[in-house]
């Protein structure tokens, strides 16, 4: 985990090896990027996607890091960076007709979220 931050008032959190495809996670992250913490939580609560659970967990971790490590108020935080990168695929096999086997790739991804104080962004 890299802890390099662009400014002193930016806190980060990473979720690694999250089950789900990168494209499905990115469509949710694109919706919350640039929004305030409170607005993002409300949006994530009512989105009909399965990937909102792990994203909410990583977002709350980033805000907790901002509170604990930097002493920032959660009401002033904005999501400055949100990205998803590809993780390793778990390879499984499904039996098919006439003794064949089809390969199934269960994809994982890495989620990174950074929050910054609203006065700095």
Swiss-Prot record:
<comment type="function">
    <text>This protein binds specifically to 23S rRNA; its binding is stimulated by other ribosomal proteins, e.g. L4, L17, and L20. It is important during the early stages of 50S assembly. It makes multiple contacts with different domains of the 23S rRNA in the assembled 50S subunit and ribosome.</text>
</comment>
<keyword id="KW-0687">Ribonucleoprotein</keyword>
<comment type="subunit">
    <text>Part of the 50S ribosomal subunit.</text>
</comment>
<dbReference type="Pfam" id="PF00237">
    <property type="entry name" value="Ribosomal_L22"/>
</dbReference>
<dbReference type="GO" id="GO:0003735">
    <property type="term" value="F:structural constituent of ribosome"/>
</dbReference>
<dbReference type="GO" id="GO:0006412">
    <property type="term" value="P:translation"/>
</dbReference>
<comment type="similarity">
    <text>Belongs to the universal ribosomal protein uL22 family.</text>
</comment>
<keyword id="KW-0689">Ribosomal protein</keyword>
<protein>
    <recommendedName>
        <fullName>Large ribosomal subunit protein uL22</fullName>
    </recommendedName>
</protein>
<comment type="function">
    <text>The globular domain of the protein is located near the polypeptide exit tunnel on the outside of the subunit, while an extended beta-hairpin is found that lines the wall of the exit tunnel in the center of the 70S ribosome.</text>
</comment>
<dbReference type="GO" id="GO:0022625">
    <property type="term" value="C:cytosolic large ribosomal subunit"/>
</dbReference>
<dbReference type="InterPro" id="IPR005727">
    <property type="entry name" value="Ribosomal_uL22_bac/chlpt-type"/>
</dbReference>
<keyword id="KW-0699">rRNA-binding</keyword>
<dbReference type="InterPro" id="IPR036394">
    <property type="entry name" value="Ribosomal_uL22_sf"/>
</dbReference>
<dbReference type="InterPro" id="IPR001063">
    <property type="entry name" value="Ribosomal_uL22"/>
</dbReference>
<dbReference type="InterPro" id="IPR018260">
    <property type="entry name" value="Ribosomal_uL22_CS"/>
</dbReference>
<keyword id="KW-0694">RNA-binding</keyword>
<dbReference type="GO" id="GO:0019843">
    <property type="term" value="F:rRNA binding"/>
</dbReference>
<dbReference type="InterPro" id="IPR047867">
    <property type="entry name" value="Ribosomal_uL22_bac/org-type"/>
</dbReference>
């Amino acid at each position: 985990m890299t802890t390099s931050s662009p400014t002193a008032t930016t806190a980060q959190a990473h979720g690694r090896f999250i089950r789900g495809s990168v494209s499905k996670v990115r469509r949710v992250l694109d919706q919350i990027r640039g929004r305030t913490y409170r607005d993002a939580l409300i949006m994530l609560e009512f989105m009909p996607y399965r990937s909102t659970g792990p994203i909410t967990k990583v977002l709350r971790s980033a805000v907790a890091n901002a509170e604990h490590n930097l002493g920032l108020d959660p009401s002033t935080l904005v999501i400055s960076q949100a990205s998803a990168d590809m993780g390793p695929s778990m390879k499984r096999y499904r039996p098919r007709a006439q003794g064949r086997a089809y390969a199934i790739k269960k994809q994982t991804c890495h989620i990174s979220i950074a929050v910054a104080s609203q006065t700095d962004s």
